[in-house]
Regions:
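The feature captures the beta-strand-to-loop junction immediately N-terminal to the Walker
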Residues: 35-37
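Conserved ABC transporter NBD signature motif
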Residues: 58-66, 78
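Conserved ABC ATPase "signature" region
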Residues: 112-137, 178, 185-188
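Conserved catalytic motifs of ABC-family nucleotide-binding domains
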Residues: 162
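Catalytic Walker B motif of ABC-type/P-loop ATPase nucleotide-binding domains
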Residues: 166-170
Length: 246
């Protein structure tokens, strides 16, 4: 059963066609990859799916509900969230405070959020920080964490909202190579332990081949190929697209 359906979606910026007639679907409970050379339209597609960019044409359905004209906060409350290539954390707040402020994409003031914190929310924050390996650093300011730790914090912040589906934009970008396997393991656990569907943009082919059960490849704003990791790895069109981009 598909949790996300993208049908004939196009998006342009002036004369630049970022996405052209893209159709794809993501099955519920799966880990699916999105690859392609720089400038192929991957991040634009993610931004369109979560409501950041209005699409020019086409349809985007989440759990069979049309979401292409809904704003980001409404889509988030439906259970569709994303993380970013560059982290979106609050550097002057500690990890627990970051978790609390992210809960249900809080639209309340900081004073109200921190004036009376339910015990269950603090416990939930600590449990999720433990899950991503940051429990010992829960009282540290987020700005003092390493970039890799900030990525883990952002993941925990997203989990705080109990999404059904999470879009991750290059979760291993900028991370020390020795820590990448740990990120992969945690993402697999997010999928298996929480039942969250993952749709992942990833630059490192090794990572996406380990993570994804199915992979879509974009090139020049169009869907070039889709298949299993093995099929994608052996697809001459995909190989040529990457070599041609170098």
């Amino acid at each position: 059963m598909s949790i996300l359906e993208v049908n004939n979606v196009s998006k342009s910026f002036g004369g630049v066609k970022a996405n052209v007639d893209i159709s794809m679907s993501v099955d519920k409970g799966k880990i699916v990859g999105l690859i392609g050379p720089n400038g192929s339209g991957k991040t634009t597609l993610f931004n369109s799916i979560v409501g950041t960019y209005p699409i020019d044409q086409g349809s985007i359905k989440f759990n069979s509900k049309e979401v292409s004209e809904l704003p980001v906060p409404v889509i988030a409350k439906l259970g569709l969230l994303r993380t970013f290539q560059q982290t979106r954390i609050y550097g002057k707040l500690n990890c627990i405070e970051n978790m609390l402020i992210s809960h249900k994409a809080s639209d309340e003031s900081l004073v109200k959020i921190f004036s009376k914190i339910p015990k269950n929310l603090t416990e939930k924050s600590e449990n999720l920080l433990s899950f991503v390996g940051l429990y010992q650093k829960r009282k540290l300011r987020a700005g003092d964490l390493s970039f890799g730790q900030q990525k883990l914090l952002e993941l925990a912040m997203a989990l705080m909202n109990e999404p059904e589906m999470l879009l991750l934009d290059e979760p291993t970008a900028g991370i020390n190579p020795t820590l990448i396997n740990g990120i992969i393991d945690r993402l697999i656990k997010v999928n298996q332990d929480f039942g969250i569907t993952l749709f992942v943009i990833e630059h490192y082919m090794r990572v996406i081949m380990q993570l994804a059960e199915r992979i879509f490849c974009l090139a020049h704003g169009k869907l070039l190929a889709n298949g299993t990791p093995e099929e994608i790895k052996n697809d001459k069109r995909v190989v040529d697209a990457y070599l041609g981009a170098q």
